[in-house]
Amino acid sequence: MSQVPAYKRILLKLSGEALMGDDSYGINRTTIEQIVGQIKEVVELGVEVGVVIGGGNIFRGVAPAAAGMDRATADYMGMMATVMNALALKDAMTKAGLIARVQSALTMQQIAEPYVRGKAMQYLEEGKVVIFAAGTGNPFFTTDTAAALRGMEMNVDIMLKATKVDGVYTDDPKKNPDAVRYQSVTFDEAISRNLKVMDATAFALCRDQHLNIKVFSIFKNGALRRVVLGEDEGTLVHC
């Protein structure tokens, strides 16, 4: 099998929940090390990697207190949770021998650089992993939308949406054992079949700007490497 990557630059979208492992909330150290190990594999192939991280694993712990809270305030809390995850991810990357930088859409100069497009692109070209934190920096936008936005700004070849399921299925594979994984599906087909790939705003951005999406499971050993090498892993959503 060829070891030449199918993509030169990728944007990896990680949900905060992916960092929980089997825990009910928070960050599972073993899980984050496993994810970083997969990222290291593709960096060593010469692939430039940007990461957008969610914050659900941390925000879940304070969600009861946020019930009834002003939506914008709750969203800002969620953004700060993504910064915590980004710092944990960077720490694990550093320990694994990777060079990583955190850029935040919210100004937190003591712990993260502000998001600057040109600087982020320079880091990618230098082989550094760039972790984009705090979503878009605006309430009412999800981290899926932030991933679509950063992916376009970084001129990535593809957006990789890492989930707990190894692709997009005809039905929920946990409930229906006869559900079949799509190898590929167009944006229009995904809409007509009501397939839940990501939130509507992010999906529309990717479709309109012709940014393909690959949905795969980050919990399958070596899955990220196989995706980057262009192997049959996950589901490709394309124009």
From Swiss-Prot:
Main localization, broad class: cytoplasm
Amino acids binding ATP: 13-16, 56, 60, 163, 169, 172
Kinase among keywords: yes
Identification of the protein by name: Uridylate kinase
Pfam families in alphabetical order: AA_kinase
Regulation affecting activity: Inhibited by UTP.
Lineage: superkingdom: Bacteria
Amino acids binding UMP: 55, 75, 136-143
Compartment(s) where it occurs, according to its Swiss-Prot or TrEMBL record: Cytoplasm
CDD domains xrefs: AAK_UMPK-PyrH-Ec
